[in-house]
């Protein structure tokens, strides 16, 4: 597998034979392809906040999984904020408004947000099913009327909201998608395999920065308590073999906070909350050279 250069030509990703078992997939590809081993794949130390931004660069501030616990977060200097979902507990409009107010007080030139599995009201199909089931799993959501959440994303007036869509800011093409492998039936959950691959196939080539809620296989996706990898195999194959972004930012797995690289793409798990839901993981900053002509 080539490292350090973008893939050439049209690449078609198919469902991986180990799709349903990410831990087995990791072991197989590590043994047979050295796919997750040094020198290409390694941990990356975070940039200290007092590091001067290089000339001709844009500084990104990455956070995720704040879960309505933003009051004590110390936000560093930067140009563009990236939040990769789970900014609420249940996606209640009151939570979204509070988050939007917090965003409004931040000084970043652009603030880009995607949903996570906790933003229940942002997932229209999920909410339709929940109504049919009489809200039995999420009784606090039952107090909402459909008109309260039909256009809940419009409450995010202080950010750019992405859902299977892209935006270009300061010359960077940024794509965002909320989907994650099924886990206890939360929002934006899909079965591993073709269902998720169909979503990843929507991501166009030429993206500079990919925002997803969950991790790809093998990069900050280890859950120690379960002794399992939980990242998406199809997402990994899409990122490494087809899209080749400069930066892939995600969260979802609180235990996986940190930075890795495969020699071409930098992977950032920016989960702010720990596994015990304490918002103590600091935001991660990352500098990228400005695209030519921007």
From Swiss-Prot:
Activity control note: Inhibited by nmolar levels of AMP and GMP.
Domain of life per record: Eukaryota
The keyword Nucleotide-binding appears for this protein: yes
Key words, A-Z: Cobalt, Hydrolase, Manganese, Metal-binding, Nucleotide-binding
InterPro entries: Calcineurin-like_Pesterase, Calcineurin-like_PHP_ApaH, Metallo-depent_PP-like, UPF0046_metallophosphoest
Binding site for Mn(2+) 2: 86, 117, 213
UniProt KW Metal-binding keyword: yes
Requisite cofactors: Mn(2+); Co(2+)
An example Gene Ontology molecular-function term: phosphoric diester hydrolase activity
Positions bound to GMP: 117-118, 225-226, 252-255
Binding-site list for Mn(2+) 1: 65, 67, 86, 254
EC number: 3.1.-.-
Top EC class for this record: hydrolase
Role, per record: Displays low metallophosphoesterase activity (in vitro). May play a role in the development of the nervous system.
Record note on quaternary structure: Homodimer.
PANTHER family assigned to the protein according to its UniProt record, in alphabetical order: METALLOPHOSPHOESTERASE (PTHR12905), METALLOPHOSPHOESTERASE MPPED2 (PTHR12905:SF13)
Similarity remark: Belongs to the UPF0046 family.
Record-given protein name: Metallophosphoesterase MPPED2
Record organism: Mus musculus
């Amino acid at each position: 597998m080539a490292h350090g250069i973008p893939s050439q030509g049209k690449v078609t990703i198919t469902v991986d034979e180990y799709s349903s078992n990410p831990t087995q997939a990791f072991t197989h590809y590590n043994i047979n392809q050295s796919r997750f081993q040094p020198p290409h794949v390694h941990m990356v130390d975070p940039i200290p906040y007092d590091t001067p931004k290089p000339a001709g660069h844009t500084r990104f501030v990455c956070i995720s999984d704040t879960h309505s616990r933003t009051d004590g977060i110390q936000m560093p200097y930067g140009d563009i904020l990236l939040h990769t979902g789970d900014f609420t507990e249940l996606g209640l409009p009151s939570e979204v408004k509070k988050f939007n107010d917090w965003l409004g007080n931040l000084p970043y030139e652009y603030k880009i947000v995607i949903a996570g599995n906790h933003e229940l009201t942002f997932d229209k199909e999920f909410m339709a099913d929940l109504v049919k089931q009489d809200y039995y799993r999420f009784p606090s959501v039952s107090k909402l009327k459909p008109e309260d959440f039909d256009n809940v994303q419009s409450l995010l007036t202080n950010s750019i909201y992405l859902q299977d869509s892209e935006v270009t800011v300061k010359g960077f093409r940024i794509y965002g998608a909320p989907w994650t492998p099924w886990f206890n039936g939360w929002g934006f959950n899909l079965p591993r395999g073709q269902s998720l691959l169909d979503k990843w196939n929507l991501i166009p080539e030429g993206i500079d920065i990919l925002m997803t809620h969950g991790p790809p296989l093998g990069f900050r996706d280890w859950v120690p308590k379960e002794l399992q990898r939980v990242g998406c195999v199809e997402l990994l194959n899409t990122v490494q073999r087809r899209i080749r972004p400069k930066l892939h930012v995600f969260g979802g797995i609180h235990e996986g906070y940190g930075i890795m690289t495969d020699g071409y793409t930098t992977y950032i798990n920016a989960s702010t909350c720990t596994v015990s839901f304490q918002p103590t993981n600091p935001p991660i900053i990352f500098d990228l050279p400005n695209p030519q002509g921007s």
